[in-house]
Amino acid sequence: MLEQLIPNVMVKIPKLIQSILETFQMMGWSGSISFVLGLFFGVVLIVTRKEGIMECHPVYWVLDKIINILRSIPFIILVPATLFLSRAIMGTGIGVKGAIIPLIIGTVPFFSRQIELALAEVDGGLIEAAQAMGDSPLQIIFRVYLKESIPAIARATTITFISLIGLTAMAGVVGAGGLGDFAIRYGHQRSEPDVIWVTILIILILVTIAQAIGDRKSVV
């Protein structure tokens, strides 16, 4: 039955599985690093902004502008533009390793801004109360900002993770491997539409799973 519906896919099962694993590798490495960096920069943005608990206009201005600039660069351009960084840090500019750096650079600015918005939702009264009790900025960050923003951070993480799935597919267009590379190499270049449709279906399943997990985590 499947041999008739998706004949080109059935003869490429090992390559499809390899592509899925490569996608998971890219998402795992870049997602983990982007989460840590994005959370850090998001916190820096919220505490150094005007009337923040550690207000510092120069720091906020520089970081805000860098994030805006990086977010404005299309990912398909960002990949070749960061090729020298991939070679310097990862030792290669192709394959899964070569995609990690551009994926991080493409994800961190977006996630940082999402974290800033999530932390901005915290009730100012709670922050003032913590300051009145003598809490240090670090204590306020962990006990108030992060603790009170867990549902919002979960939503931001879900949105970013879904965006990252799309970026990994796009990275495949420039030879990074994964599902995007599988769809382009076999589906598009060899005119095998069933390969493209199966790839789309797998990506939709990944997005659905990520959204379902995110919805559960974001429930207060």
Residue ranges and their predicted role:
Residues 18, 22-26, 71, 75-110, ...:
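Loop-to-helix entry region at the N-terminal start of transmembrane alpha-helices
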Residues 137-168:
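Transmembrane alpha-helices
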Residues 167-197, 201-202:
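Glycine-rich helix-loop "coupling/hinge" segments at transmembrane-helix boundaries
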Residues 44-82, 103, 108, 114-117:
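Cytoplasmic-entry segments and transmembrane alpha-helices of multi-pass inner-membrane transporters
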Residues 44-50, 132, 196-220:
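C-terminal transmembrane helix and the adjacent membrane-cytosol boundary/short C-terminal tail
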Residues 16-47, 157:
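Transmembrane alpha-helix signature in integral membrane proteins
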Residues 119-149, 189:
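Short helix-to-coil transition segments within interhelical loops
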Residues 1-31, 56-61:
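Periplasmic/extracellular loop-to-transmembrane helix junction in inner-membrane transport proteins
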